[in-house]
Amino acid sequence: MGQDYTPTWSFLTNHAQVLICIAHDPGVRLREIGETVGITERAAHRIVGELAAAGYIWRRRNGRRNHYTIQSHLPLPDPLAREQKIGDLLAILAGEQRSETER
C-alpha cells in the first residue's frame, strides 16, 4: 500500500455520516444527505427513519421541510462504545459544541 492507495471502505457507517449531515444542517433535505454521503435518496430516507425509530433524532415538519433534532445525550449503540454518547461522537466528527446540559 503506497501513498496513492485510496480505500474503498469507510470507518464511518452511513448512519454516522447521515448524523453528521444533520448535525451540520438540521434542515438538510434527504436528497442533499444522499448526495453528501454517496447513497440514494431512498437509502437516506430509510436511514433517517431508522435513526428516528431508535430515538436518536426527532423529526419535526416545518412547512414543506423537515427539521431534525439530534438526541445527543443518548449512548452510542455499539458494544465497545456504550459509555460514549452520540454528542461525544459528533463533537469529534462534526465539530459540534455541546452545552453543559447536553453532557
Named regions from a protein language model:
Residues 1-3, 75-103:
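Amphipathic alpha-helical dimerization/coiled-coil segments
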Residues 4-15, 29, 61-84:
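Short, cationic-aromatic polyanion-contact patches
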Residues 16-21:
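Pre-recognition alpha-helix immediately N-terminal to the DNA-recognition helix
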Residues 35, 52-53:
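Alpha-helical residues within the helix-turn-helix
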Residues 42:
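Key DNA-contact positions within bacterial/archaeal DNA-binding proteins
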Residues 48-49:
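Short, hydrophobic-biased segments on the C-terminal half of alpha helices
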